[in-house]
């Protein structure tokens, strides 16, 4: 239970230490934030997908919107817009599910990291797909987005 919190704290501490270094370039900084975002999204997905999660069938009934096209960091605005509904859904099962008890912390971390990556501007109007996705698909697609962005930055 505390190992997830410790891992999250260690990862955040490493990001903060790395970001305080004067030699850090903006691209390297963005990559580090993306790596932190990736970790937080993966932790949420692990908690939801846990084979002992009795609430998974209920969680899969809630639907989320994905952007039509998410290829740039500015598209993280679309993720941010769905964090409120995601938080609400996870709160429904959090009290009785030990695997999701840190969901609020992960959502807060994701919100802060997204703000750092996309900036404070809310100029992008998200164009969402007409079809909705489950919470598992939602997190999986954003994980793929982060992995793709990190891969692009390291080339």
Curated annotation (Swiss-Prot):
<keyword id="KW-1015">Disulfide bond</keyword>
<dbReference type="GO" id="GO:0005125">
    <property type="term" value="F:cytokine activity"/>
</dbReference>
<feature type="glycosylation site" description="O-linked (GalNAc...) threonine">
    <location>
        <position position="23"/>
    </location>
</feature>
<keyword id="KW-0325">Glycoprotein</keyword>
<keyword id="KW-0964">Secreted</keyword>
<dbReference type="GO" id="GO:0005134">
    <property type="term" value="F:interleukin-2 receptor binding"/>
</dbReference>
<feature type="disulfide bond">
    <location>
        <begin position="78"/>
        <end position="126"/>
    </location>
</feature>
<protein>
    <recommendedName>
        <fullName>Interleukin-2</fullName>
    </recommendedName>
</protein>
<keyword id="KW-0391">Immunity</keyword>
<dbReference type="InterPro" id="IPR009079">
    <property type="entry name" value="4_helix_cytokine-like_core"/>
</dbReference>
<dbReference type="InterPro" id="IPR000779">
    <property type="entry name" value="IL-2"/>
</dbReference>
<dbReference type="GO" id="GO:0005615">
    <property type="term" value="C:extracellular space"/>
</dbReference>
<feature type="signal peptide">
    <location>
        <begin position="1"/>
        <end position="20"/>
    </location>
</feature>
<dbReference type="Pfam" id="PF00715">
    <property type="entry name" value="IL2"/>
</dbReference>
<dbReference type="GO" id="GO:0002250">
    <property type="term" value="P:adaptive immune response"/>
</dbReference>
<comment type="function">
    <text>Cytokine produced by activated CD4-positive helper T-cells and to a lesser extend activated CD8-positive T-cells and natural killer (NK) cells that plays pivotal roles in the immune response and tolerance. Binds to a receptor complex composed of either the high-affinity trimeric IL-2R (IL2RA/CD25, IL2RB/CD122 and IL2RG/CD132) or the low-affinity dimeric IL-2R (IL2RB and IL2RG). Interaction with the receptor leads to oligomerization and conformation changes in the IL-2R subunits resulting in downstream signaling starting with phosphorylation of JAK1 and JAK3.</text>
</comment>
<keyword id="KW-0339">Growth factor</keyword>
<dbReference type="InterPro" id="IPR030477">
    <property type="entry name" value="IL-2_CS"/>
</dbReference>
<keyword id="KW-0202">Cytokine</keyword>
<dbReference type="GO" id="GO:0008083">
    <property type="term" value="F:growth factor activity"/>
</dbReference>
<keyword id="KW-1064">Adaptive immunity</keyword>
<keyword id="KW-0732">Signal</keyword>
<comment type="similarity">
    <text>Belongs to the IL-2 family.</text>
</comment>
